[in-house]
A protein has these predicted regions:
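Clamp-loader machinery-focused feature within the broader ASCE/P-loop NTPase space
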Residues: 1-101
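Conserved catalytic/switch belt of AAA+ P-loop NTPases
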Residues: 79, 104-118
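Charged, glycine-rich active-site and insertion segments that engage polyanionic ligands
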Residues: 1-4, 14, 115-118, 124-198
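Conserved adenine-binding aromatic site and its adjacent loop/helix in ATP-hydrolyzing domains
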Residues: 76, 108, 135
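Structural recognition of the conserved hydrophobic beta-strand(s) that form the central parallel beta-sheet
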Residues: 89-93, 106, 117-123
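Residues immediately C-terminal
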Residues: 97, 112, 128
Length: 198
């Protein structure tokens, strides 16, 4: 069960995340992107929405969103009995990307959830959620990474030289994804690196 959760393949662990149509995938639903989602979270555990959209091949100015149809399908899935575990878990990544109709569809199940069902809403800005959704959740704030944490991570995992890791940690403002992006530019001259960062 733990191995299935780690690989994001547990049958009682559902995922909703912003999607968009691409040349390869014509249905903008989370299920269609699930293999790519698992790959993305393994490769970029601190990835942001733009990283995700790039990973799935979204081109141009398309923005990801979570459709009302997707919300209705997840309600159907959650109404089923759990397959293996005692609880069913729904992870909604970037719930700020719910449009009005999808938020309203999910609101119904948040108001009256099936027994032994947990909802995890992982967002960057809780103020962008509908107040009716926010009022039905228990907020847990995750602090930004400290400069020391980022410096240590960059030195150990990305093999960035210590003084350079400290500079990047300071510039990244507690955002490990931003720090990793900045560290990839370390081969460039300092002036070029700073210009790109700006």
């Amino acid at each position: 069960s733990c191995a299935k959760m780690r690989k994001l393949v547990h049958p009682d662990f559902y995922h909703i995340f912003p999607t968009a149509t691409t040349k390869k995938v014509k249905e903008a639903e989370s299920d269609a992107y699930l293999p790519l989602w698992r790959e993305f979270t393994a490769e970029q555990p601190y990835g942001a929405l733009p990283n995700w959209l790039e990973h799935i091949g979204v081109e141009g100015n398309k923005q990801g969103n979570i459709s009302a149809e997707e919300a209705r399908k997840i309600i159907q899935k959650l109404s089923l009995k759990a397959f293996e575990a005692e609880y069913k878990i729904l992870l909604i990544w970037q719930p700020e990307m719910l449009n009005q109709s999808s938020a309203n569809a999910l609101l119904k199940i948040l108001e009256e959830p099936p027994a032994k069902t947990l909802f995890l809403l992982v967002c960057n800005d809780a103020n962008k959620l509908l107040t009716t959704i926010l009022s039905r959740t228990q907020r847990v704030s995750v602090p930004q990474f400290s400069d020391e944490d980022i410096t240590s991570y960059l030195a150990e995992k990305a093999h960035v030289e210590s003084s350079r890791a400290k500079q990047i940690a300071y510039l990244s403002e507690g955002n490990l994804n931003k720090a990793l992006a900045l560290s990839k530019n370390q081969g460039q001259g300092k002036h070029q690196w700073f210009a790109n960062w700006m």
